[in-house]
Amino acid sequence: MLSLRVACLILSLASTVWTADTGTTSEFIEAGGDIRGPRIVERQPSQCKETDWPFCSDEDWNHKCPSGCRMKGLIDEANQDFTNRINKLKNSLFDFQKNNKDSNSLTRNIMEYLRGDFANANNFDNTFGQVSEDLRRRIQILKRKVIEKAQQIQVLQKDVRDQLIDMKRLEVDIDIKIRSCKGSCSRSVSREINLKDYEGQQKQLEQVIAKDLLPAKDRQYLPAIKMSPVPDLVPGSFKSQLQEGPPEWKALTEMRQMRMELERPGKDGASRGDLPGDSRGDSATRGPGSKIENPMTPGHGGSGYWRPGSSGSGSDGNWGSGTTGSDDTGTWGAGSSRPSSGSGNLKPSNPDWGEFSEFGGSSSPATRKEYHTGKLVTSKGDKELLIGNEKVTSTGTSTTRRSCSKTITKTVLGNDGHREVVKEVVTSDDGSDCGDGMDLGLTHSFSGRLDELSRMHPELGSFYDSRFGSLTSNFKEFGSKTSDSDIFTDIENPSSHVPEFSSSSKTSTVRKQVTKSYKMADEAASEAHQEGDTRTTKRGRARTMRDCDDVLQTHPSGAQNGIFSIKLPGSSKIFSVYCDQETSLGGWLLIQQRMDGSLNFNRTWQDYKRGFGSLNDKGEGEFWLGNDYLHLLTLRGSVLRVELEDWAGKEAYAEYHFRVGSEAEGYALQVSSYQGTAGDALMEGSVEEGTEYTSHSNMQFSTFDRDADQWEENCAEVYGGGWWYNSCQAANLNGIYYPGGTYDPRNNSPYEIENGVLWVPFRGADYSLWAVRMKIRPLVGQ
């Protein structure tokens, strides 16, 4: 029985296994045979349960591998990854666009703000330059006034000292006369003199005089601030990138930067021979490898040349002068006042701008007028003062002056046949063309005095103030009194002359109505107004200065050093000079200069008479102004200033009251009242050699071809250079230029003698100075 049970169990198990292998169980279950009630079913996240997929062979790839479930999973995973990356890129792009827009807006605002700052900075720079220049000018004026007042105080101190000495001398004289009266005077007059009081006052006064009221030497030159834009602030490569960049960045190309430099007028940064980069063009021995710079042949970038009588920057418009009339016509020239041979009319003493009224009047027959003018032809460039007939090859300014004259002959008959004949002839001294459009002016007649015109025309009273001066001469066109007008350059010619004759038994009246515009040589405009029978002409003209002090007071650019045109009283010639307005009171006219030995000063009498050499507009060069000019410039007395500088940079000066005689007097030298630090070489001379043999005062001028010295031989021939020799010299600024300073006279040929550029009291006779200058200015009070 037990074995049967075991066999049944084995059969049951075998059937169960067989059912599972053949799928009958599944069918059975599907048929509902395994239903045992509700059961919990777990949802699988994916039907792809297998993760370990076998490798696919080539033949199994299409129909068996890979699994679709596996492919779907890989595709979904890659799609999700790409989607995340794209979203991240989109978010980054949106952020960058927003930031870019914000940065562009901020950049634009910043550049606009900076553009305004740049404009304000440029305005501030310009304002600062103007204010500093105005301040410097005011300080210069104040300094000049202080120096002038200090000199006046010194003069007053000397006057007080002289008066004190005179009072003391007078006291002594009175005491002597009282003591000499032995009669009743000795019994009735009791007088005591206290000389100690005078001595005490004199000592106190000497202490006051000993105080130096003038500014120190180191404060003599007032520095100037020079502002100039910096070129190429942005390099070229960056500038091209800015041009191609956004519009807001182009504001950087408009940015300007100013360079500010502090300059000292009259002083160079390296003005000594032992300093590198010497800019003054000195001789070859001043430094190794240096080269003499000849001012007659300037190098690249040097200044041009300017001949005397020319007109350029820094000078007024010059005009030809010297009109000539008939025997009964008043004659006058520019810048002077002299009576005519007939009526004695005078030119206005101050020929500034003014207003003139012309009234009709009776005319006399056979009235002749002659006008003269000068025509300038100027080319651009720098200017240089050229003295004498020195030939200069340069690309600078060249000026040609053409002198032209216009003669008008006018004839008016009486009532028995009215006839008016006007003949005009224009001639030139050198045969040059004066131009068809040139108008030499008109002749204006005046009734009454010019000071009455300001009362007649109060609305035009500004023309009669102190700026333009008062014109007090009387002018009449017809009759025995006539005068000539200024010289004008016609710019417009709408004039109409309408003669009107009135019937009369004795006289003929001519009325003119003229409307004409003129322009002067310095481009000053003037107008002519027509009012019935009265013609009023407002004129302008350039006032010609007579010296550098006049230039300092009246010229718009007179406070700066430079070349100016002047015209001496009593002379019709206009010539150019160099004015030094920085030294002392200013107004110094340079008459001689030595600075590099480039010019030979051993010249003839005629050379020294006319002058020779050249200067550029910076005052560099060697020259002699001319003895004729020295005589005319010092007629009324002048102050001579001699400035000396040795090769070590030591400076000294000497000042004298100065006058040069005429050629008939041998250009005799008259000096007095020495002041300075160089020593008195012109009056006292050399003490060792003897004052009577070496003093230059009252000596005539001598050259190698005209001996006027006190020596038995010719000093000018032995020592070289024209000078006021005695027997022979204690000073000779026109001697031989020896580079280096000290020289051995034994090496000189043909004469073994001290013939350098010397001032014996300063550095001795065997020392040739590096730079010397002679300047003159009018005496104070003239």
Swiss-Prot record:
Superkingdom: Eukaryota
Cystine residue pairs: 404-434, 715-728
Signal sequence segment: 1-19
Region (Disordered): 264-374, 522-542
The keyword Disulfide bond is annotated on this UniProt entry: yes
Glycosylation sites (chain numbering): 602
Gly residues biased stretches: 311-323
Biased amino acid composition, Low complexity: 324-344, 354-364
Domain description: A long coiled coil structure formed by 3 polypeptide chains connects the central nodule to the C-terminal domains (distal nodules). The long C-terminal ends of the alpha chains fold back, contributing a fourth strand to the coiled coil structure.
Function, in words: Cleaved by the protease thrombin to yield monomers which, together with fibrinogen beta (FGB) and fibrinogen gamma (FGG), polymerize to form an insoluble fibrin matrix. Fibrin has a major function in hemostasis as one of the primary components of blood clots. In addition, functions during the early stages of wound repair to stabilize the lesion and guide cell migration during re-epithelialization. Was originally thought to be essential for platelet aggregation, based on in vitro studies using anticoagulated blood.
Name used for this protein in its record: Fibrinogen alpha chain
